[in-house]
Swiss-Prot record:
Gene3D superfamilies registered for this protein in UniProt: 3.30.1370.30, 3.30.1490.10
Superkingdom, taxonomy of origin: Bacteria
Matching NCBIfam families: PRK00136.1
Organism listed in the record: Staphylococcus epidermidis (strain ATCC 35984 / DSM 28319 / BCRC 17069 / CCUG 31568 / BM 3577 / RP62A)
PANTHER family: 40S RIBOSOMAL PROTEIN S15A
Protein's recorded name: Small ribosomal subunit protein uS8
Length: 132
């Protein structure tokens, strides 16, 4: 069976692993998932990202991050633009997540970037997801 929304699958896997406090998780690789994983790492939501090449499409290995007393760093993930209802925003309409405490992942002509970076570069695009 084919997967209709691989990004939602990625976010669901991260959410589920985070809820049961797994140290790492693996998911099928794609270019957009790699970009999303790198943003999550650079923004401090996950510890590390590894790419494992195999004969097929490869695997992304995410190492989740937890604070003191094993508290979750990622408190929420929400898919915004879905295959059945795409959500786009112009450069001046890119939303802030929780007044700047979270990030919005924006797919632009310059690749996948955060909402802050999109405002700084003055570009709009498809709002992929919110992370907080």
């Amino acid at each position: 069976m084919t997967m209709t929304d691989p990004i939602a699958d990625m976010l669901t896997r991260v959410r589920n692993a985070n809820m049961v406090r797994h140290e790492k998780l693996e998911l099928p690789a794609s270019n957009i998932k790699k970009e999303i994983a790198e943003i999550l790492k650079s923004e401090g939501f996950i510890k590390n990202v590894e790419y494992v090449e195999d004969d097929k499409q490869g695997v992304i290995r995410l190492f989740l991050k937890y604070g003191q007393n094993n508290e979750r760093v990622i408190t929420g993930l929400k898919r915004i633009s879905k295959p059945g209802l795409r959500v786009y925003a112009k450069a001046n309409e890119v939303p802030k997540v929780l007044n700047g405490l979270g990030i919005a992942l924006v797919s632009t002509s310059e690749g996948v970037i955060t909402d802050k970076e999109a405002r700084k570069r003055n570009v709009g695009g498809e709002i992929i997801a919110y992370v907080w």
